[in-house]
Amino acid sequence: MRKSLALILLFAFCSYGSDSTIDEPTQSSASSNIKELVYEDTTGTMVNVDLTNKKTLVVFWADYWGICREELPLLEENLATISENYNVIALAHSNKNSTMTWVSENLNGELEIGFSTSELRDSLKIIGQPISIIFDTDGSILLREYGYVPSDL
């Protein structure tokens, strides 16, 4: 997971202050753009993310998965830098009560936390977690990183 996060951070830092763009999505990305990104926030309200203002990093995670529990504090530590160029959202696919307990005990409240919907998971073919996806402002997938990659490889 640390290597996955490192790749995402590298991607974020490399595009920071750069006028270059990524012309084509990665090979592992979905073939079409998403029309909307809707999730449930921690109060139960459905939120439609504005993808047009800047690129969006979405991390699909679960509080019961150790590698996810390692990644989110690291993501939150680097949030100030990443959020200069990216909307950042962590969407849980786990029990709301246990997720919110874990979040309150392990995070500082800076990272936007929500819950993925079955429609969103189906449209993006999310079958497990952690999965990190970076969306361009047109809804196309620029980067899709699956699971844990040992940092010593």
Predicted feature residues:
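N-terminal targeting signals for export/organelle localization
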Residues: 1-38, 143-153
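A short beta-strand-turn-helix
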Residues: 36-56
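Short pre-active-site segment immediately N-terminal to redox-active cysteine/selenocysteine motifs
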Residues: 54-56, 61-64, 128
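Conserved redox-active cysteine motifs that mediate thiol-disulfide chemistry
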Residues: 60-76
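Solvent-exposed loop/turn segments at secondary-structure junctions
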Residues: 62-66, 94-98, 119, 148-149
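Short alpha-helix adjacent to the SAM-binding motif of class I
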Residues: 70, 77, 98-105
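Thiol-based oxidoreductase modules, predominantly thioredoxin-like and allied folds used
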Residues: 86-98, 109-118
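Short, internal strand/loop/helix patches
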Residues: 104-137
